[in-house]
Amino acid sequence: MCPPQAQAEVGPTMTEKAEMVCAPSPAPAPPPKPASPGPPQVEEVGHRGGSSPPRLPPGVPVISLGHSRPPGVAMPTTELGTLRPPLLQLSTLGTAPPTLALHYHPHPFLNSVYIGPAGPFSIFPSSRLKRRPSHCELDLAEGHQPQKVARRVFTNSRERWRQQNVNGAFAELRKLLPTHPPDRKLSKNEVLRLAMKYIGFLVRLLRDQAAALAAGPTPPGPRKRPVHRVPDDGARRGSGRRAEAAARSQPAPPADPDGSPGGAARPIKMEQTALSPEVR
């Protein structure tokens, strides 16, 4: 064991050494660094197994982003910053859909399987619009219902038959219409209009013929018998002379040997012939 005097001498020296070990040596302050455009360097402090970093003594210099800029102070923006917004703002703007005007939205009548429904700025309300199913939807819907398929085929065939009958009737009517070029092609509308005009012309023609027959001469009635007139004396004398001349011009019949009346008339003629030169 040391004497008490030696212990008294050793005591202050040990306490001084302990204080020197415990007290940190003052480190020289680093010179101020010029401001650079890059981010400030931060001194990394290792973790000692704990989730929060250990507290440093007040004398150790530490650069912190929170203490470097006081709250409430806005950073001055340069011309480049004002002309070109940050990438963060561009990303946020890209996610939101741009607002379109009324005429840029899809038309409500063009809705189909591949085109979505009309936007909120549609012209007509969506409750009044009925979307027509496409051919694919009809095929899928009717594939499991054979009755509807058969009914549709029957309806289509009946419609084709009706259309053929209508076309045939128009063709027959076209043959009855007189046109200047006989082989002139006419539409159904023109055929109907020409048929109406032609029918009106025929009606007027029949009326004119009936009016002409009504205004013509009277039909022939029963014939009247001719009236017999009594001839005068002069007419009688003329007729007698004509009869005598006709009798003279006729030849006399031959006389019979038995003394027929023809033989008795013969001497009379001879006497007349004999007397005739004397009369002259």
Swiss-Prot record:
Extent of Pro residues compositional bias: 25-40
SMART domains, alphabetized: HLH
Molecular function as annotated in GO: DNA binding; DNA-binding transcription factor activity, RNA polymerase II-specific; protein dimerization activity; RNA polymerase II cis-regulatory region sequence-specific DNA binding
Biased composition (Low complexity): 257-267
Bias (Basic and acidic residues): 229-245
UniProt keyword terms in alphabetical order: Chromosomal rearrangement, DNA-binding, Nucleus, Phosphoprotein, Proto-oncogene, Transcription, Transcription regulation
Compartments it resides in: Nucleus
InterPro entries: bHLH_dom (IPR011598), HLH_DNA-bd_sf (IPR036638), TAL-like (IPR040238)
Residue intervals of the bHLH domain: 150-202
GO CC, one annotated term: nucleoplasm
Sequence positions bearing Phosphoserine: 260, 276
Record Gene3D superfamilies: Helix-loop-helix DNA-binding domain
Region feature (Disordered): 1-60, 214-280
GO term, biological process aspect, one: blood vessel maturation
Disease entry from the Swiss-Prot or TrEMBL record: A chromosomal aberration involving LYL1 may be a cause of a form of T-cell acute lymphoblastic leukemia (T-ALL). Translocation t(7;19)(q35;p13) with TCRB.
Quaternary data: Efficient DNA binding requires dimerization with another bHLH protein.
Designated name of the protein: Protein lyl-1
Organism this protein belongs to: Homo sapiens (Human)
Gene: LYL1
